[in-house]
């Protein structure tokens, strides 16, 4: 049996890990000890969590947890997006040379991050490009929430048709996966609808 802490970038990732991911991992003997909204700043003695662009605060938060949990049966991972990554993130600027090789770029950044934290139990995960990219694995599942918007559903299908892999939907300011969803469905509630659509799609297809 192993225990796992997940540091999530936002509420969408937190809900996904707390529900769908936790159930899947438990079946394989890995139990999520806690899903923590990752720190992004510390002001006036208070830690502010979720999102943010301060890598230093995020690293300090993770290191603090690794020091508190010294057992060999506990591991640490993350759920953060490649899109809009912190400017001071380890390997951030060097990884630009790999922009044309997105999976290699993510692997390079994960390796750089792991080395920077310096604990073998820390196995970071960076999503290419956003969590919402996973939802494009089967966009038809959005019909449960937007059945009265067939034109929007068709637009989702056309976006996927233009890519070999939903994860390759790019990370531009206006074209990142979440931006496309908000453009098509302005009332899209990402922290609620996102994890529910992911559950409908299923981890096997998302993977």
Where are these regions (language model features)?
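Catalytic nucleophile-elbow at a beta strand-turn-alpha helix junction centered on a G-D-S/GDSL motif
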Residues: 6-15
